[in-house]
Amino acid sequence: MSDMINSDEVNKVIEMIRSLYGENKCITDDNYDKSLAVKCVNGTFVGKKNENIIEYKGIPFVGKQPVGDLRWKAPVDVVPDDGVYEAFYNGKTPCQPMGDLSSAYVQGEDCLYLNVWKAEGDSDKKKPVIVWIYGGAFETGGTVAYDMHNFMKENPDVIVVAIGYRVGFLGFCHLSHLSDGKDFSDAQNLGLLDQIMGLKWVHENIAAFGGDPDNVTIWGESAGAGSCTLLPLIEGSQKYFKRVIAQSGAPGQTRSEEQAIECTDKVMEALGCKTVADLMKVDGEKLATTAGELFGMYQVLGIRTFPERDGKYLPEDIWAAYANGAAKNIEFLHGCNKDEMNAFLAVFGPEVFTEWGKNRLEENLAKFTDEQKELVKSYCRDIGGESYEPYNRVIGQMLFLAPQIRLSEEQTRAGGKSYTYLFTPESTLPLMKSGHAVEVATLFNDPNDTALSGRNFDETYGKILRKMWVQFAKTGNPSLTADISPDGKAYEWPLYDLEDKKVMVLDEFDIHPEKETQRKIVDWDRTYFLTDYYIP
């Protein structure tokens, strides 16, 4: 996609992002604005006011950052602190491979910080809390890329938090099979444990900001959404949140122990390492870069630095856990975009994407029975258009569409609640259509970000979506009555049920519920079975 974006614009974005970092200092005198100070367990933090929104940046949610001997160790809880600290600048972004955007990040292993946004003024009523978890294929991403200011201006009756977590080889790395790896039995799912520690901090401190610790919704897109659908399955996590908003990500974004070990061994071979002690001598940037070159999101090796179905934190069978009711007490709003894979088509270009898709499909066909192989081939044969289109559609079914419907099915069958959507507005950029992540800027109320959409979607439409998301966070139901709807019209969003299978079609000028079987989001006969396989 880099050829679609003006280099001058990229440089402006990089410069802007870098300006958001800085050192938050300890305040040793009494010369600070007390109205902007919030006392938390691990210190008093002083924010900055931007219009009518108070922003707190770079608050540590751990007692010690995961550096030195704490690399590949579970996050350390905070300790009480009576100090007063600035919360003016973003903390460091986790180590990750360099790309167009990530090259702007100030990276480091000391990366476990969070940001809080709240409206100015006090309220007698505790406000619902929304916690954002960023995406990036579990390999990239950071809180600095997401500014909730405009979202908060429109929705001052909630509080928003964005939490950082370790990604890539430093966040998801199996080490316990190594000769000196027995003390690193959590390394395979550290990114998720970081998220839980961040949620624990929110639970213990958000009341001081005016938030309700018993009404927390976790919200993510892509790998952030995958995180949000995995966190309910980790023992002890559900006390920190009650709702999930998951955009374009599902719990199938995981790997087996065997795949995780293969990933570790390949990185060690590339670095010439034999033990954890050897790996400890390699700096974080080198580790991230090496893993990114081997398993980056655009590679076709079929193994990724994803969360591991380790049987310790995540169940070995994710879908069985959902079917057995592991998340039935958590309310879900989730879905995806109708042309998810078009974003990757736009990145690669048709020729490279076609070759990538062919390799990807052949790699996964090897896992299937002969009957299943013929079902997939039949599905591909029925798709017309350009040579890349069969791969575009079937991989979209594998990674996005079918898992979303499976999530609705299992959650509903177990007695839980699922509100499901399909986002349909299209980008004006070549090949993009309604591709992966084109909706994010609209939901953040950021009209200046058209990098993926190529345009601003209808203003009223954006307001309706944001109101639905906030209404779900408040009440557990995204439906809008006419008196609170931005266009004065009521929108009744039905729960997914096993008979009607209704989803909310988020058309730009016609938001309406529709039976999944009418919309044909998933091919029940030829592609739904793909969800029985974990495809990293």
Model-derived features: positions:
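Mobile gating loops/cap/lid regions near enzyme active sites that modulate substrate access
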Residues: 95, 401-536
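Short Gly/aromatic-enriched secondary-structure transition segments
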Residues: 51, 55-79, 346-368, 488-492, ...
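Alpha/beta-hydrolase fold catalytic core
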Residues: 367-414, 419-425
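Substrate-access "cap/lid" subdomains that shape
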Residues: 100, 197, 204, 238, ...
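Non-catalytic accessory segments of hydrolases
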Residues: 2-189, 213, 452-465, 476-482, ...
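Serine-hydrolase-like catalytic core of hydrolytic proteins
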Residues: 101-276, 322-344
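C-terminal, loop-rich substrate-recognition/catalytic regions characterized by aromatic stacking residues
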Residues: 75, 327-375, 512-536
